[in-house]
From Swiss-Prot:
It is found in: Cytoplasm. This is tRNA(Met) cytidine acetate ligase. One of its GO terms (cellular component) is cytoplasm. HAMAP family: TmcAL. Catalyzes the formation of N(4)-acetylcytidine (ac(4)C) at the wobble position of elongator tRNA(Met), using acetate and ATP as substrates. First activates an acetate ion to form acetyladenylate (Ac-AMP) and then transfers the acetyl group to tRNA to form ac(4)C34.
Amino acid sequence: MTITGIIAEFNPFHNGHKYLLDQAEGLKIVAMSGNFMQRGEPAIVDKWTRAQMALENGADLVVELPFLVSVQAADFFGQGAVDILDRLGIDSLVFGTEEVRDYQKIADLYTEKGAEMEKFVENLPDSLSYPQKTQAMWKEFAGLDFSGNTPNHVLALAYAKAVAGRNIKLHPIQRQGAGYHSVNKDVDFASATALRQHQKDQDFLERFMPSVALFEQASKVIWEDYFPLLRYQILSNPDLTTIYQVNQEMAVRIKEAIKTAQSVEELVELVTTKRYTKARVRRLLSYILVQARESNLPEAIHVLGFTEKGRQHLKSLKGQVSLVSRIGKEPWDAMTQKADQIYQLGKPSIAEQNFGRVPIRIETN
C-alpha cells in the first residue's frame, strides 16, 4: 500500500486541505506544525483541534513538528518535516502548489549538484535576503523564475531539496481557488488567511470549512494577544543575542522599535529591512516570545492522533521508530513544551497542551 506524507499547518483546516487529502492515496500521514507557524505566528486554534480536523477529513495519522522545525525558513522546515515522515515510512509526498512543475526533476538535479548549489548560495552578497538567495540559486541551476508571492511553490522547492537522494516520490497538486494570502470571499476554495480574517462570519466559515463546529468551539488567538508578553520579554532581556538566531543588528533594531511600537504589526514594520523579511522578523519575535535557545531536535516523534488504519501502521513501526503518545514526567521536547505553555497564556480558556494528553482516536474515516 502507498504511504503518503503531507506536511501541513492547517491554520485553520479548510476545504483546500480536504481536497489535498482526498487527492492523496493509501495511508495518509500528516506532519503538522504545533502551536507556532512557519511564518512566525501563533496558530489560530491549538494543535489538538487542528489534528482532529485533519483526522475527520481523511488523515490517518497526525504527528507534531517540534517548535524548532515548525518555526523556520522554508528549507529547514521542509528538511525537518521530511526527516520525520521518512522515518515513518512514506514513499510519496503530496503537496499543494501554485505552479505545477516537474519537482521530481528538480529533486534529481539537487541530488546531483546539491553541494555546488549550496556553494553558489554561500558566495552571494549578504545584502540579499535568504529567499532572494534561494531564488537566485534556482534561477541559475534550474532556470526557474518565481516571485515571493507563491509561498507554496517556495515550500515545494524546499521539499524537492529535502527528498533529494531519498526514496520518496513527489506529487504536486495544483492549488485550488484563492491564493495563499488572498482574502477574497467569492471563490470555490478560500485561503487560510481569509478564514482567519473572517473568523466571525458564520456563513463564510460554513462554506469553506469542513469541521466548522470544532473551529467555532475552540479558543482562538492572534499575535496581538501576546504583545504585552512579547514586550515584557524584549524590555526585560539585557541581551537579546542570547536568543536563537537573533544577531547584534536585529537585537539593536528590536530594542529601538519596541520603544514606540503599539502592536506586533507595527513592531514588524519597524524592524523589517530589505535583507530581513517580515516572515523572518516574525520568526525572531516568536523566538523571543518563547525564549528559544539552540537545542537538539527530539529523537522521538510525538503522535497527536490516528484512525484505526493509522494505529495499525504505528504498530508496524514498533521497535524501529521512537514514538511518544503521552507526555508525562519525561519530556518529549522541552523547547516545544515551553512554547506550548506560553501559547496557553494567550487565552485563559486554552486547554493544557501536553501533560496527560493522549492521542485523538477516530474510529472511522
